[in-house]
Regions:
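PAS-family sensory domains
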Residues: 12-15, 352
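Bacterial N-terminal signal peptides that target proteins for export
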Residues: 1-11
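N-terminal signal peptide c-region/cleavage motif recognized by signal peptidases
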Residues: 17-19
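Acidic/proline-rich low-complexity IDRs
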Residues: 6, 14-15, 294
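Subset of outer-membrane beta-barrel
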Residues: 23-437
Length: 437
């Protein structure tokens, strides 16, 4: 099969994956009701088990989309294809109630190859955020003046959507040491939320009255630009330190958001707002230490400047319906990751070529919930990469993750997830074969 045919097959596979991933949301978190949804981990097969570290990772056999400067180090003879999926079991608890949920989702599709010496290209598809929830609350609000029966309200919340990113990037090594790179991404997705509220006199089996509904909807389309740099420092024969940093440019999302309210009197009130969403500026930095091509230890820190970003909120009353573009609903998010990878002998027997990985991460909330800070996130991960054959550079990646999402604010839900991440990294020496042909 020629290189062109293989590239055509890859493009077809990626388009199929894009369609599959865009149809799935993989979430049951009630916290995805706020902001742009729950923010996704965009790490891939090799670094997902390492906590998501990426800034100082530069490897010729891996596609590190979180720092595009790393593309400059891709092996000159290889075409790398990386794809992964996740299985998630969640346990959500709060105020005496417990709910379990199961989800499966395609997590990423990436590829990379070298264009010429010191110049590499990366392309791929990853989810940016996820909206997915369906829950209800029942509250006693008083008693009827005529029957003295209790009046309760049942509110059902439903949401679906999230943002997806299709990106292409290049990494360049202009001179010995320094590498620079950039990703430009096209982002799109749905922002769909609904609220249905019913009042009951004497219980849900009785006739309801004064029902009202709200439906939020927006079809979001925008861009994302990430700029990165890396610099390796050879400490001695056996030790290499690589430092790296990236910056993501924040900007308005110009699409319109619509709020439709259906009142108990049968009226429909519609309100719209433009430029109601915004992406934050993000600054990330980190470093990795590699010892004898066997042990890698890395750590990253990211600051996401969400504070002051725009988000729509409702100003609906009994007779009016309007949207306010608020700038006080977000918090700056701090994200810390650390991880390690060990391989006994990259050129040894099969068992010696298995990668063992560990990682942890911590993130503060980016949204406020009823004026209080949202949940913090804690994660512990472990995994392996198994060679497909004795001498192959292609691997099967597998890792498990425990994610704990909780807030110090009373009354908020605590979420615990056990996740299994499975992926494959194909590393074929296409261009070497072409040379012999």
């Amino acid at each position: 099969m020629t290189i062109i045919k293989r590239l055509s097959s890859f493009v077809a596979a990626m388009l199929l994956a894009v369609g599959t991933m865009a149809q799935s949301n993989g979430s049951n978190s009630s916290y995805s009701r706020f902001g742009l949804g729950t923010l996704n981990d965009q790490s891939t097969g090799f670094n997902r088990a390492m906590g998501g570290v990426a800034q100082g990772i530069q490897d010729g056999n891996k596609v590190n989309m979180l720092n595009p400067a790393s593309y400059s180090a891709i092996d000159s003879l290889s075409f790398i294809f990386d794809a992964g999926m996740g299985l998630q079991y969640g346990r959500l608890s709060g105020e005496g109630a417990k709910v379990t949920a199961f989800n499966a989702t395609l997590e990423y599709v990436n590829a990379g190859f070298r264009l010429k010496r010191g110049l590499g290209l990366g392309i791929g598809f990853v989810p940016y955020s996820t909206i997915g929830y369906n829950f209800n609350t029942t509250t006693r609000v008083g008693s009827s003046y005529t029957s003295s029966q209790s009046i309760t309200t049942k509110t059902t919340y439903y949401g679906n959507g999230g943002l997806h990113e299709l990106y292409i990037g290049m990494g360049w090594n202009p001179f010995a040491g320094l590498s620079i790179g950039a990703n430009i991404g096209y982002m799109w997705g749905d922002y769909d939320h609904s609220l249905a509220q019913n009042f009951y006199e004497g219980g849900e089996s009785s006739k309801n009255y004064n029902a009202q509904n709200e439906v939020w909807s927006s079809n979001l389309k925008t861009y994302k630009l990430d700029i990165g740099a890396q610099y390796p420092i050879k400490l001695n024969k056996n030790n290499l330190l690589t430092i790296g940093a990236t910056m993501s440019l924040g900007h308005d999302i110009k699409n319109e958001v619509k709020l439709i309210r259906y009142t108990s009197q049968g009226d429909t009130i519609t309100s719209t707002a433009k430029k109601a969403f915004e992406l934050p500026y993000i600054i990330s930095a980190g470093a990795s230490w590699k010892h004898k091509e066997q042990l890698t230890i890395a750590a990253d820190y990211s600051l996401e400047r969400w504070d002051g970003c725009k988000v729509p909120v409702s100003l609906a009353t009994a007779t009016e319906n309007s949207i306010k573009v608020a700038t006080d609903q977000y918090l700056n998010r701090h994200h810390i990751t650390a991880g390690a990878e060990y391989i006994n002998n990259p050129l040894g027997k099969y068992r010696q070529r298995i990668y063992y990985r560990l990682g942890v991460s911590y993130a503060t909330p980016y949204v406020k919930i009823n004026g209080h800070d949202g949940p913090n996130e804690y994660s512990i991960r472990a995994g392996v990469a198994l060679p497909m054959t004795i001498r192959s550079k292609s691997f099967i990646n597998a890792s498990v993750e425990w994610l704990h999402r909780t807030s110090s604010t009373s009354g908020l839900i605590t979420e615990n997830y056990l996740m299994l991440h499975l992926g494959v990294t194909f590393n074929e020496r296409w261009f070497e074969k072409l040379r012999f042909q």
